[in-house]
């Protein structure tokens, strides 16, 4: 497969890194430093404007995929539109699939959508995808990750087993889970374990549970502590990600949401939109403000400002002041291990959603959903078996899954 990637920032770089081992990849960026970094990969790097028709004409022939992921929505959309026009005027050229990264809510109102009529086969909003991911996690206060599959019919939730947990030392078969729930994987240090009933649960294990959403409501009492009150959430930062997330939380009856935003005008705007949230004008690193809001009583603190450094500082302060759980946004991939190293419960990245959607398109027919967990240590793939599939009619224990897959 041949892929053309426009934009060599965090998202573009990681898409290129994921695709380059088995595909022909061209990456275009007008920034000299970004292009130089991309040159470290086994890809063809072109320094220039990715929306330029002349440059696109040179690289689009035989391309299966064009992904525009610069930091400017309009550049990404124009690049896709231009690519479609070029292909339309070239006899014999294949119809390249186009994907645009878009952040402006005026252009998109769901994490992934299609605008094929204007030349964009797929629009992906990393910020909205991130907000949806965090909202899923917040529905289980003890969870460190959560994803929905099969159009909401199946839920994956990941829990961390603390050294003080009552589960430490018990066998897997002793877990009192609903009939429709199973532990599908355990992450233990650098190992990924497919568990069996006689396996022991150890401190610091990360356990992945899959099941029907309605059957997983009691998991809090198994893996965490059942919250008897409305979940108290403090959101620091109400930019694009924060606003998307606040709207999702604001709809939940069992959530008590407070927001700290440094921009006074943004506070006024947010307060007019949200019905149930308390919006505070201030700085998330202001210790006196955090204490005034009784941060030690917060079930979850979520830091999603546009600055990784500020999110890290806010999160560290929140943990030090007694917040039960802290989730922080980290745009830079090299920061993700740092966040977890210093004790932040969970670091989330907007780029992963975009990378996952692009990878899904390269993995062949039948792939409905693809997501990574544990910092890309593992992939979860939702696959639809066609009528002609070789696995139809076979018991699951007779299917030869790839090595390392359950």
Curated annotation (Swiss-Prot):
Q: Does the keyword Repeat apply?
A: yes
Q: Which SUPFAM superfamilies match?
A: NAD(P)-binding Rossmann-fold domains, TrkA C-terminal domain-like
Can you supply one Gene Ontology CC term for this chain's record? plasma membrane
RCK N-terminal domain: which residues? 1-124, 230-348
* GO function term, MF aspect, one: potassium ion transmembrane transporter activity
One matching Pfam family: TrkA_C
Per the database record, which ranges form the RCK C-terminal domain? Answer: 144-225
The signal peptide stretch is none
In which residues is NAD(+) 2 bound? 232-262
Sorted UniProt keywords: Ion transport, NAD, Potassium, Potassium transport, Repeat, Transport
Question: InterPro entries annotated for this entry?
Answer: K_uptake_TrkA, NAD(P)-bd_dom_sf, RCK_C, RCK_C_sf, RCK_N, Trk_Ktr_HKT_K-transport
Q: List residues binding NAD(+) 1.
A: 7-11, 29, 70-71, 101
Q: What does this protein do?
A: Part of a potassium transport system.
Q: Please give the record's comment on domains.
A: The RCK N-terminal domain binds NAD and possibly other effectors. This is expected to cause a conformation change that regulates potassium transport.
Q: What is this protein called?
A: Trk system potassium uptake protein trkA homolog 1
The organism encoding this protein is: Methanosarcina mazei
Coding gene?
A: trkA1
């Amino acid at each position: 497969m041949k892929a053309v990637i426009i934009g060599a920032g965090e998202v573009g770089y990681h898409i290129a890194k994921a695709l380059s081992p088995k595909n022909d990849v061209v990456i275009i960026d007008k920034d000299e430093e970004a292009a130089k970094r991309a040159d470290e990969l086994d890809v063809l790097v072109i320094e220039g404007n990715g929306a330029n028709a002349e440059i696109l004409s040179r690289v689009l022939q035989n391309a299966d995929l064009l992904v525009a992921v610069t930091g400017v929505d309009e550049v990404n959309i124009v690049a896709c539109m231009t690519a479609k026009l070029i292909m339309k005027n070239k006899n014999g050229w294949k119809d390249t699939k186009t994907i645009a990264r878009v952040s402006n809510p005026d252009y998109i109102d769901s994490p992934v959508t299609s605008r094929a009529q204007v030349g964009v086969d797929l629009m992906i909003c990393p910020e909205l995808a991130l907000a949806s991911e965090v909202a899923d996690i917040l529905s289980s206060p003890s969870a460190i990750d959560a994803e929905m599959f099969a159009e909401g019919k199946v839920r994956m939730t990941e829990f961390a087993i603390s050294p003080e947990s009552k589960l430490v030392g018990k066998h897997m078969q002793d877990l009192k889970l609903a009939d429709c729930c199973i532990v599908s994987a355990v992450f233990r240090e650098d190992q990924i374990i497919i568990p069996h009933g006689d396996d022991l649960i150890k401190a610091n294990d990360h356990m992945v549970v899959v099941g029907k959403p309605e059957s997983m409501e009691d998991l809090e009492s198994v893996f965490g502590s059942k919250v008897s009150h409305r979940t108290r959430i403090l959101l620091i930062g109400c930019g694009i990600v924060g606003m998307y997330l606040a709207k999702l939380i604001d709809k939940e009856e069992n959530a008590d949401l407070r927001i700290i935003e440094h921009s006074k005008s943004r506070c006024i705007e947010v307060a007019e939109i949200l019905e149930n949230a308390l919006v505070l004008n201030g700085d998330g690193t202001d210790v006196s403000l955090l204490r005034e809001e009784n941060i030690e009583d917060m079930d979850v603190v979520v830091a999603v400002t546009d600055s990784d450094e500020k999110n890290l500082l806010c999160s560290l302060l929140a943990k030090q002041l007694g917040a039960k759980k802290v989730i922080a946004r980290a745009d830079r991939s090299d920061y993700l291990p740092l966040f977890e190293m210093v004790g932040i419960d969970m670091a989330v990245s907007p780029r992963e959603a975009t990378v996952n959607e692009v990878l899904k398109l390269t993995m062949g027919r039948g792939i409905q959903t693809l997501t990574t967990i544990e910092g890309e240590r593992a992939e979860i793939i939702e696959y639809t078996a066609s009528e002609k599939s070789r696995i139809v009619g076979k018991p699951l224990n007779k299917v030869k899954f790839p090595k390392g897959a359950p």
